[in-house]
Amino acid sequence: NEADLYIRISNNSDDESERDLYRKKFKELMELAITKDPENGILYYNLGVISSEQGENDSALEYYKRAIEFKPDYVDAYLNLVAVILDGEQSIVDEMNSLGTSKKDNIRYDELKVEREDLYKECIPFLEKLIEVSPTNIDALNTLKNIYGVLGENEKFKDISAKINEIQG
């Protein structure tokens, strides 16, 4: 279809502005398709992908959530949703690592630590639901295990570690 054509052309283009133009056209066509099929989770997922690629993370989050609403077993939508949430982590970690040892820096470090933990906590329900839908998804299990480790939820960390070991034999 026309939307697929635009995304393929954009993927094959070496020209950044041309690629952006085709991706915008793809996005417009996906938005039009949603007006005709408003409960199609795949359309929302595609909009999430394009929004994420364009740095529109708030829109991407909403589109992924809508994709899951209409297609609750959509593994890729859960994975991408968590990835977008965790996208904010690197800037937090970078700032944490750049701080010194002054009282002001220690206060800022503690604030950033809370922000980082909040990102992790936001991911937990999506990862848990994803694991319900896809119980052997190692990426989701590892991510959830790591989050539990950072948050100090040792029992949950051990439970997820045991599941991973069971799956991997």
Task: Name each model-derived stretch.
Residues 6, 13, 51, 85, ...:
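Residue at a conserved register position within TPR or TPR-like alpha-solenoid repeats
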Residues 32-33, 66-67, 130, 164:
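Canonical positions in the second alpha-helix
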